[in-house]
Amino acid sequence: AVTLVMPRYRVVHAAGRGGRRLPLTMGGRAFEVGLVEVPHGPRERVVLVECDELYDREGLYGAGGQDHPDNAVRFGVLSRAALEYAVGLESPPSIVHAHDWQTGLVPVLLRTRYSADPVWRRIPSLFTIHNLAYQGVFPAETLSALDLGSELLSIDGLEFWNQVSFLKGGINFADTLTTVSPAYAREIRTPEYGEGLEGLLVHRQHVLTGILNGIDTDTWNPWTDPYLPAPFSAADLGGKRFAKRAVLTRYGLPDDATAMARPLIGMVSRLVGQKGLDLVWEGRGALAAMDAAFVVLGSGERRYEEMWRDLAAAHPTRIGVRVGFDEGLAHLIEGGADLFLMPSRFEPCGLNQM
């Protein structure tokens, strides 16, 4: 059986509230945390960590182009709550799998706070790095706010240029490390892609493995996709034009014969420099001059959000923008676009390319 633990963000819609109460104190501050179990399949369950003061807000990690200022505490509480939930199970887990900086403290806590327990001392941890550029770096005094000892402010702990890095903590303390592709596992051990952690990753390369990401070919199958207005396949593209027209309609763009004959270029992406948005910025005039329509779905750095909004305002019949994320619209764009705009600087794996 697999148990997934995640925050109950505002955008999470699931039945039930309250659940098991978990009084939790961190850095002298008390938090009222709820643990709500949600069935998710015959051998899977989801546990939602409820704490409205931390998770019931706009944006998962930030809003308005800025990180939430208390992200260290938000994800420190998540890490503690996940482990406290696991400790309360009848049977301990076979392995604890943490992802990215947001849960980088989980391996740290396993080898510090929970290391005195003879059962938990033997449970291995796996830490997966999805993107090394996002490191969860906070001021050094964050350690005390998380009830972590000052000895962790060291090269073998979380210290990173006189600050603390949750990602580095996960890399240092996990028993095994993975990335989302074999190529990325090699790349992050170089100065070009190591983001200042290449030395540590070379040191730990004996436990580092790249495992290629995948997509659910049932979910992303245009023949059966419920988000598409008509089915199609590589062998029968007849239904694709209905998806294209639906995209144009959703964005308020013309959908007459001329518009349908024009290439539709889609972009479903985080709007950040890594995705090559600086290249789009430099070439925005040439892009706007193309006899093509553009539809964009994503969020990220404010300057790139505003760039696309300005382009849409200047070319309202050919450029449409939605800032945010919409699962159904993402499927519609993937199904209806003729081309995709993907000028990424680098990709740890590249799910959209898949």
Residues of each region from the PLM?
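Catalytic cores of nucleotide-sugar-dependent glycosyltransferases that transfer UDP/GDP/TDP-activated
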Residues: 1-354
